[in-house]
Structure formats: structure tokens, C-alpha cells
């Protein structure tokens, strides 16, 4: 993110496709709604239940600099999306918007199971699970994010599943 010029940073897999026109406008508008810019914005990925987990997400440079990371580096291939979803849900700043960023994953029959997938799928999950379960560490980061938010703003879901472009 340090080499990026923009203030909104996306974390995503390399097997995605943007299926919503003007998705970038919708993301920017969501960030504009929150002057403190502390939120995690995501859309439907075609695999997870809508609104459940931010598998591919956007966050602000301000939020990244507060916690000191785009995502925890020690997670490897798995569970950092769970970590980020849990953190932003805890502060009421997990924002699900009507964009479809399709995850073209082998597990859904959308791509061949190649060497790259094999490397990620065969990676040890136990360490990532253990890291994800480190509530004390996550709570510390949640508190850091809370210090940066304007408590007069409350999150509300402006989008409903039936409006979502699936």
C-alpha cells in the first residue's frame, strides 16, 4: 500500500472479476459517507453468503496507518479476511455495498486447480486458525480503530439483499 497513490486500498485475491459497472464510484461514495474514513467496504463474491465475510475488501489509508497493516502479515493464505471482518464488525464499520466482485475460485468449479491454488490450499491452516483465535491481539487492534472513529456517526445498512446485483 505504501507505493499506491490513492487513499483507498483494495485487498483481493488474484482470481476475481468485477461484474458491477461503476463499482469504483460506489466504493468511493461509501467512504465519502464517513468523514473519519475508518471502515471496511466489501461486496458479494459469488461464494460466501451475501454480507457475511469480506473476502475482497477496501479500506482507507487512514485506517491502515492506525493499525499498522493492510492485513496481518503472519496469516499466510488463510483467515486474514475473517480477522478483518471481525474487527470492523466489532466497531460497527463493516460496510456491505451492492457490488459483485466475483471470486473465480477452483472450489466453486470456476477455475482449474493449478499449482498456485495447490500452494494456497495445501498451506497449513492450523497456524492461521490459531492466529485468528488470538482475541487479545485482535481486541487491541479493535481499540486502536475505535480511537479513530467519530462516534456521532452510526453505521446502518443502506442496502438490502434483494437490491443486490447477483
Model-assigned labels for residue ranges:
Residues 1-2, 85:
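Short, conserved alpha-helix that lines the donor NDP-sugar binding/gating region
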Residues 6-17:
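Short beta-strand-to-loop acidic/aromatic patch adjacent to the donor-nucleotide binding site
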Residues 11, 38-44, 97-106:
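Short glycine/serine/threonine-enriched helix-capping/active-site loop
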Residues 16-56, 62:
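Conserved donor NDP-sugar-binding/catalytic core segment of glycosyltransferases
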Residues 78, 82-166:
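C-terminal catalytic/acceptor-binding lobe
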Amino acid at each position: 500500500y505504501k507505493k499506491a497513490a490513492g487513499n483507498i486500498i483494495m485487498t483481493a485475491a488474484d482470481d476475481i472479476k468485477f461484474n458491477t459497472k461503476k463499482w469504483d464510484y460506489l466504493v468511493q461514495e461509501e467512504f465519502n459517507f464517513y468523514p473519519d474514513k475508518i471502515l471496511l467496504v466489501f461486496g458479494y463474491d459469488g461464494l460466501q453468503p451475501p454480507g457475511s465475510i469480506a473476502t475482497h475488501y477496501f479500506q482507507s489509508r487512514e485506517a491502515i496507518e492506525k493499525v499498522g497493516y493492510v492485513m496481518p502479515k503472519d496469516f499466510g493464505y488463510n483467515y486474514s479476511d475473517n480477522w478483518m471482518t471481525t474487527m470492523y464488525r466489532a466497531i460497527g464499520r463493516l460496510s456491505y455495498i451492492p457490488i459483485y466482485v466475483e471470486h473465480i475460485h477452483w472450489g466453486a468449479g470456476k477455475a482449474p486447480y493449478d499449482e498456485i491454488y495447490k500452494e494456497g490450499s495445501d498451506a497449513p491452516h492450523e497456524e492461521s486458525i490459531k492466529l485468528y483465535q488470538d482475541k487479545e491481539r485482535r481486541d487491541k487492534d479493535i481499540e486502536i480503530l475505535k480511537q479513530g472513529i467519530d462516534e456521532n456517526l452510526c453505521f446502518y445498512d443502506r442496502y438490502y439483499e434483494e437490491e443486490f446485483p447477483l
